[in-house]
A protein has these predicted regions:
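Short glycine-/polar-rich loops that comprise or flank the Walker A/P-loop
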Residues: 17-21, 335-338
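Structural signature of nuclease core domains in nucleic-acid processing machines
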Residues: 5, 28-500
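Conserved helicase C-terminal RecA-like lobe
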Residues: 1-16, 303-304
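Acidic beta-strand-to-loop metal/phosphate-binding motif
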Residues: 22-26
Length: 500
């Protein structure tokens, strides 16, 4: 009854305009997590197929429609055409003077005493902390120096969904390994293990599930069905591979299977801790080839441009650390890094016509679920990862040309060695900046509208103004494969010369 009343109210609202109707909807929430449009959007699109969907203007011209936002826009280019317009108006003198004065403002640096008071002699760095430090020094200071936190509401939010999916996948694969591996399990047997893992999660984390709202229970049931499909897909991948899961939730740190990764600088020490979702291995000719796998419930993917700027280091860091420290843990064989893979742990959203053939939908779904990452450029290793990879790869982030050449996100053993040195250099740089007291607001950005500021929880404390004082956007430039490796060679070469 309530639903029909809401539909009636919606119809009445849509029928009110006499000249123009604009319908808008968000594509992400306040934290950047993907959101699905309301079913109403789909109905409108089907009723009015000739209407195209417009995305928010990249230049945000709409800011000029109101005086307050237009003034803010003028402040981004002091002396520009819009600034000159307000100068001629004469009634914005105080605002312009304030913005000009703010352009000379600098945040400064923390004193050595303040750094010691906030961080001590050693800081703990996790994947999220490293990314925060590289994406904006001020945001890192707020979150991990002052320990400021935004208020959070109740609910089964994105991080909890990720934890649930990770938990079920880990326990299902662990149970499958104890029963002889995925090759020995039928689809029905696999689903039984999934259900057992879900029940164990409910008993441990959601014992009051039946007391939750009807909406919560519906969303949770839908999530459980999605996990079944995700596990089917992961099972298919591993059944077509010689790589086998060797470890789950492999931890680096005080209570982990491996020690924390220690970075020592003159002004302080950093200890990198974290967990690897899964480590797969292939034993060949006395060598153990390892790949590190990370489950992603969001749309995170491997990006050379981000890696160049020091974001998303953790997977490679774990891989290179396993090469140096993992020998005793995995039987004593020499370890060879074979790559890193981000595995989608979500149901993809597909844009298909209502009459699209099932086989086309499945093909589009497979494409969306292709792994991203970087793998070793070695035909034997690639074929061991996926048996059909040299003819028709389905899972790996590579492609095969008509002449049989393999392209994609590949790296030779030599290149991975160079990358290991580069990652180590970035870790030392992060450590130096933290202990130097750097609190600059210097967010990384793809565009002015797609930056570390876009969903930052500390915007109200920061008041970032690009170009004002020390505030500046650090733009991430798209990086091609050859450009990336050339850059790595240049940086490593400079470091070698300075050491010499």
């Amino acid at each position: 009854e309530q639903f029909h009343l809401e539909i009636q109210n919606l119809y009445a609202a849509l029928a009110q305009p006499t000249e123009k109707l604009t319908v808008s909807y968000p594509i992400s929430d306040g934290k950047g997590a993907e959101k699905r449009p309301s079913f109403v959007i789909g109905r409108i699109a089907r009723l009015l197929p000739s209407i195209s969907v417009e995305t928010e203007s990249v230049d945000k011209e709409y800011r000029l429609s109101a005086r307050t936002t237009a003034l803010e826009y003028a402040g981004e280019q002091i002396g520009g055409a819009l600034w000159q317009y307000f100068e001629k108006q004469g009634d914005a003198k105080s605002a312009l003077e304030a913005m000009r004065a703010a352009s000379h403002y600098t945040r400064g640096r923390l004193s050595p005493g303040a750094v010691r008071a906030l961080y001590g002699d050693a800081v703990t760095l996790s994947a999220s902390r490293m990314d925060k430090a590289r994406s904006c020094h001020f945001a890192y200071f707020m979150r991990y120096g002052l320990r400021a936190k935004e208020r959070t509401g109740a609910g089964f939010d994105a991080p909890q969904i990720g934890t649930f999916v990770h938990d079920v996948m880990e326990n299902t694969l662990r149970a499958a390994k104890e029963r002889g591996g995925l090759h020995a399990l039928s689809e029905e047997a696999l689903h039984e293990l999934v259900r057992a893992s879900i029940e164990a999660y409910i008993d441990r984390v959601l014992p009051d599930l039946n007391e939750k709202s009807a909406r919560f229970q519906y969303l949770f049931r839908r999530l459980c069905a999605a996990v079944d499909r995700i596990m089917d897909e992961v099972s298919e991948e591993l059944k077509s591979s010689d790589f086998e899961p060797l470890a789950f939730e492999l931890a680096f740190g005080a209570d982990g299977q491996l020690p924390a990764i220690t970075i020592r600088e003159k002004n302080g020490t950093a200890r990198v801790v974290g967990k690897v979702d899964r480590v797969d291995g292939w034993l060949h000719n006395g060598k153990l080839y390892l790949r590190v796998v990370d489950y992603k419930t969001g749309k995170k993917s491997f990006d050379l441009a981000e890696l160049r700027y020091g974001l998303g280091l953790q997977m490679l860091l774990y891989l290179f650390t396993l090469k140096e420290e993992g020998r005793a843990l995995f039987g004593g064989q020499e370890i060879v890094p074979a790559g890193i893979l981000y595995t989608p742990a979500r149901e993809p959203m597909l844009r298909c016509a209502r009459d699209t053939a099932p086989e086309k939908i499945e093909k589009a779904r497979k494409k969306e679920l292709r792994r991203s990452g970087m793998v070793l450029e070695d035909p034997a290793v690639l074929q061991a990862m996926e048996h059909s990879t040299l003819t028709s790869p389905c899972y790996l982030p590579i492609a095969v040309k008509k002449d049989g050449a393999v392209t994609g996100s590949l790296a030779s053993a030599e290149q991975l060695g160079k990358l290991s040195k580069y990652v180590d250099r970035l870790l030392h740089e992060i450590t130096q900046e933290v202990f130097a007291g750097n609190i600059d607001a210097d967010p990384y950005a793809r565009t002015p509208q797609q930056s570390a500021c876009t969903y930052c929880e500390f915007a109200s404390a920061c008041h970032f103004e690009n170009g004002c004082g020390s505030d500046r956007m650090e733009y991430i430039k798209a990086t091609k494969n050859d450009e990336f490796w050339q850059y790595i060679d240049e940086v490593n070469g400079k470091e070698a010369r300075s050491d010499g």
